[in-house]
Amino acid sequence: MSRIGKLPITIPEGVKVSLNDLEVRISGPKGELSKTFKGNIVVLLAENKLLVKPLAVSKNARAMWGTARSIISNMVTGVKEGFQLKLEVNGVGYRAMVKGKYLNLMLAKSHNTKIEIPPDIKIDVPKQNIIILEGIDKEKLGQFASIIIKQRPPEPYKGKGIRFENQFIPRKEGKKN
């Protein structure tokens, strides 16, 4: 029995859910999301609540049960409230700015790094060293944040690089003579 999978998902006011075979489509004030699940689980709508049930007793069906429930719960939260991630750019001369539909990063490389911003993600750069990402799809938001972080991951000696806000980076001691 999955502890997460058996919990019902309450649908808040202003959010509409439609179920077609294996596809779950959720729309709300912030936008619309849809996801198709494989045949291991079934999603039921009952009295303003969504229930996720496994179709088989197989190991794969039980593994996807809690995962599918969490994905659907994040979809409901996303179309109702949205998600936000903050990234910090640490380092001398490291800067970020938005130019059109590109995020321009200056990260002490021989060239500036340009990353195309996906259409469903909004980026705000209030300061040169803070990047705020907003969107309704938690999965795409995390994927895009990881693409940004991969450009210059935080290093353990001086802490320079791009990281999530309040992320702990274990520090190492430098060389001793």
Curated annotation (Swiss-Prot):
Q: Which domain of life is it from?
A: Bacteria
User: InterPro entries from the xrefs?
Assistant: Ribosomal_uL6-like (IPR000702), Ribosomal_uL6-like_a/b-dom_sf (IPR036789), Ribosomal_uL6_a/b-dom (IPR020040), Ribosomal_uL6_bac-type (IPR019906), Ribosomal_uL6_CS (IPR002358)
Q: Which GO terms describe its cellular component?
A: ribonucleoprotein complex; ribosome
| Biological processes, Gene Ontology terms | cytoplasmic translation
A GO molecular-function term, please? rRNA binding
Question: Which UniProt keywords are given for this protein, alphabetically ordered?
Answer: Ribonucleoprotein, Ribosomal protein, RNA-binding, rRNA-binding
Q: Which Gene3D superfamilies match?
A: Ribosomal protein L6, alpha-beta domain
Identify the PANTHER family for this entry.
60S/50S RIBOSOMAL PROTEIN L6/L9, LARGE RIBOSOMAL SUBUNIT PROTEIN UL6M
Q: What function does the entry list?
A: This protein binds to the 23S rRNA, and is important in its secondary structure. It is located near the subunit interface in the base of the L7/L12 stalk, and near the tRNA binding site of the peptidyltransferase center.
Family stated for the protein in its record:
Belongs to the universal ribosomal protein uL6 family.
Q: Which HAMAP family match?
A: Ribosomal_uL6_B (MF_01365_B)
Whom does it interact with, and what assembly results?
A: Part of the 50S ribosomal subunit.
What name does this protein carry? Large ribosomal subunit protein uL6
Gene designation: rplF
